[in-house]
A protein has these predicted regions:
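Predominantly late transmembrane helices and immediately cytosolic-facing juxtamembrane segments
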Residues: 300-308
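Short beta-alpha connecting loops at secondary-structure transitions
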Residues: 289, 308-311
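"…together with the soluble PPM/PP2C metallo-phosphatase catalytic core" -> "…together
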Residues: 1-263, 267-301
Length: 311
């Protein structure tokens, strides 16, 4: 039994390494082509005026917001290369496993219990973010373009409702873990708690994009932390899925560190933020989001203070 367990662990480490490596190189390959598209169609960053960036021309705004001003016009929607890579790899290995046995069957990590929902919400949030980005580029919408904050929040809530339904009714989740205290069954309260976690994570993540390597670097650290947690829990398909995200993020950072060629945009930050929230709930460690995502919390807290103080 010990030998079988050791072989199983080694096999999963190999899966993680292979998927992360493939994700890294796929992102490296498609990024130059996508960058050309961004430049050709002038899909550049516009500074928002409906969030903390409203304070760019006033004293005392968040440091990140002040730095954003110099970045206006830098191509955005770079996050497409990340989530597209994850989708391609996940579906690609799943298709190969359906046509071939042996090695390819082992590499498949597309499972109902661990990766269906994270991938599904990633795609949903990515498309929502892409719409928001494009509206901002065209300056369609209120205060500089993009979706209204209220509309984005409603869509976050929708994603949270779908996720809560899946977790509660399909996967049987009804408890939360509080560090050092254990699991607590909360019954139907699990649904609003799930929705709150998704909305809070998505909102916080969405406020940090736009500085060279900042959002991608933070996401890489956070997904890495949750990969360790998932590995410890034996959720190997989820770990492999997270390794695909991390491999793509490393490649994204290759292009995104100073001077950044592009930013991930809302299509990147929204998709990764919502996915992170789902992963936290899937591993039943939502309260660990607080120490793991402290930078997101600080920046989003600064945003909220700015908005409420101006009102």
């Amino acid at each position: 039994m010990g030998l079988d367990s050791e072989i199983f662990s080694i096999l999963n480490v190999v899966r993680i390494f292979i998927v992360a490596t493939v994700a890294f190189f796929v992102t490296l390959l498609i990024t130059p082509a996508w960058t050309k598209v961004l430049h050709k169609y002038k899909l550049g960053k516009q500074i928002r005026t409906d969030t903390a960036f409203k304070s760019l021309h006033t004293e005392g705004g968040p440091i990140a917001a002040k730095l954003h001003q110099a970045k206006e016009g830098t191509p955005t929607m770079g996050g497409v290369v990340m989530w597209a890579t994850v989708v391609i790899i996940t579906i690609g290995f799943w298709l190969l496993a359906n046509f071939f046995d042996g090695f390819w069957s082992t590499m498949n990590f597309f499972s109902r219990a661990q990766t269906w929902l994270p991938l599904g919400v990633m795609i949903f949030a990515a498309l929502l973010g892409a719409l928001d980005d494009y509206m901002g580029i065209l300056r369609v919408g209120p205060k500089g373009g993009g979706l209204r904050m209220s509309h984005r929040m409603l869509l976050y809530i929708l994603a949270g409702v779908v996720g809560a339904w899946w977790f509660f009714f399909k996967l049987g989740f009804n408890s939360i873990n509080i560090p050092f205290m254990g699991d607590f069954i909360i019954g139907w309260w699990y649904i609003p708690f799930f929705i709150f976690t998704i909305v809070a994570t998505a909102f916080s993540a969405n406020e940090t994009d736009g500085l060279d390597g900042l959002a991608a670097g933070i996401f890489l650290t956070m997904f890495g932390a949750y990969a360790v947690i998932a590995f410890d829990q034996g959720r190997m398909d989820l770990v492999v899925f997270l390794s695909a995200i991390m491999g793509s993020l490393v490649a994204f950072l290759w292009f995104n560190i100073y001077p950044a060629r592009f930013f991930m945009g809302d299509t990147g930050s929204m998709s990764l933020g919502v996915t992170l929230g789902v992963v936290a709930m899937l591993t039943n460690t939502p309260f660990l989001l607080i120490p793991i995502g402290i930078i997101f919390i600080i920046e989003s807290g600064s945003v909220i203070v700015q908005l409420t103080s101006k009102k």
